[in-house]
Amino acid sequence: MGGTASTRRVTFEADENENITVVKGIRLSENVIDRMKESSPSGSKSQRYSSVYGASVSDEDLKRRVAEELALEQAKKESEHQRRLKQARDLERERAAANEQLTRAVLRERISSEEERMKAKHLARQLEEKDRVMRKQDAFYKEQLARLEERSSEFYKVTTEEYQKAAEEVEAKFKRYEYHPVCADLQTKILQCYRQNTQQTLSCSALASQYMHCVNHAKQSMLEKGG
């Protein structure tokens, strides 16, 4: 127990199913065993691995190497974990950027559709306003035409009455003289025109004007002769 360093023989057992070596209850992979073999000094027979079976090392050295290899494996696992986390974060950022671009594209499309809808609505309002103005103007022109036709009809009625009155006066004054109807041809034409254009008497205004001029001229001539 004094000055001699104690050594213990440790047997490496292989797991046939998983290629795992068990050292004193610790399961080591083949990669860990290979690295432990490579890091062992080549001159020391007590610390060399000659094969998977029958190799012996000191207990303390074995614990140290196992701890180092486990720490290395843990570091590699942590590094791989961090790498995968980084990939996941990068993928999430890419997915978020793609979603943002898609959202913006959909928003632009909605804005464009809304602008087109507003333009179409504005154009429809303009067309409705133009149609309303045209209907109003049409009603105004029809009203003016009706008034002109009414005035023309009244004018014809007054002229006819005046002519009849003048004719009666002349007949009473000059009974002994034989006379013929004044402006008979124009009277016939204007009567015929009014019969043919009962809804558009304004078209006979030119004949009515000629007829009135003819009647006035006849009256003046009769008065001059009678005087």
UniProtKB/Swiss-Prot annotation:
Motif Cx9C motif 2, residue range(s) on this chain: 204-214
Lipidated residues (N-myristoyl glycine): 2
Gene Ontology, cellular component aspect: MICOS complex; mitochondrial inner membrane; mitochondrion; nucleus
Residue span(s) of domain CHCH: 180-222
Modified residue annotations for Phosphoserine: 29, 50-51, 56, 58
Result, substituting residue 2 to A: Loss of SAMM50-binding. Reduced affinity toward OPA1. No effect on IMMT-binding
Modified residues (N6-acetyllysine): 142
Entry function: Component of the MICOS complex, a large protein complex of the mitochondrial inner membrane that plays crucial roles in the maintenance of crista junctions, inner membrane architecture, and formation of contact sites to the outer membrane. Has also been shown to function as a transcription factor which binds to the BAG1 promoter and represses BAG1 transcription. Plays an important role in the maintenance of the MICOS complex stability and the mitochondrial cristae morphology.
Family that this chain belongs to: Belongs to the MICOS complex subunit Mic19 family. Metazoan Mic19 subfamily.
Protein name, entry field: MICOS complex subunit Mic19
Lineage: Eukaryota, Metazoa, Chordata, Craniata, Vertebrata
Gene: Chchd3
